[in-house]
């Protein structure tokens, strides 16, 4: 039988006093999770630290791409960010700086940050199976000297996210290996996928 649970709405943002049906075999508590999964190994716990060390710094400096997740009143957002390797600057062992290059001006992430500073980053390095995860709190800076330090071809970013690190740890390469992400044999012919124009046309 289906159970009734309040304040859960799978079709969109949570609605006050909303009630929906929870499908059978749905996990609804941490106790149920703990009964299914073994405790993490000691190395899995020990790899998480609150500041950068030399290996973690090297990973960030080698990365040309990361995803940036944020949270706000309208929900969650995950945004791709990329540039030359090391485009996210290591200010010190506790701080990162990420330039906001000119784009489509949706600025979903920035709108979230001014309301809730919590962010999470996932760094990828081409050819490297391990990834690096950073959790922290961001602020949006328009400091002229900071903007100028990120100028490329004479063009400075509009703003820079300054991120205070709360936690940093590497993720093992299993997901990347299983997906064949860096394997040329797994690469998809772009012409077999819908173009940006086709996706825009199909939005309705």
Task: Give, region by region, the residue ranges found by the protein language model.
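Binding-site signature for planar aromatic cofactors or substrates
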Residues: 1-204
């Amino acid at each position: 039988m289906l159970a009734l649970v309040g304040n859960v709405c799978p079709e969109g943002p949570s609605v006050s006093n909303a009630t929906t049906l929870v499908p059978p075999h749905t996990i609804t508590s941490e106790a149920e999770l703990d009964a299914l999964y073994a405790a993490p190994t000691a190395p899995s716990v020990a790899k998480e630290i609150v500041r950068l060390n030399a290996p973690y710094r090297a990973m960030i400096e080698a990365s040309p791409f990361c995803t940036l997740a944020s949270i706000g009143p309208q929900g969650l957002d995950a945004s791709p960010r990329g540039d030359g390797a090391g485009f996210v600057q290591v200010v010190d062992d506790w701080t990162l700086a990420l330039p906001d290059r000119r784009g489509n001006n949706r600025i979903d992430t920035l709108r979230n940050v001014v309301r809730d500073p919590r962010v999470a980053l996932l760094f990828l390095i081409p050819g490297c199976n391990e990834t690096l995860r950073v959790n922290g709190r961001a602020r949006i800076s328009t400091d002229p000297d900071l903007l100028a330090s990120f100028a490329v071809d004479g063009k400075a970013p509009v703003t820079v996210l300054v991120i205070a690190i709360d936690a940093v740890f590497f993720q093992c390469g299993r997901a990347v290996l299983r997906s064949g992400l860096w394997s040329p044999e797994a690469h998809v012919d772009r012409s077999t996928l819908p173009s940006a124009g086709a996706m825009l046309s199909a939005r309705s």
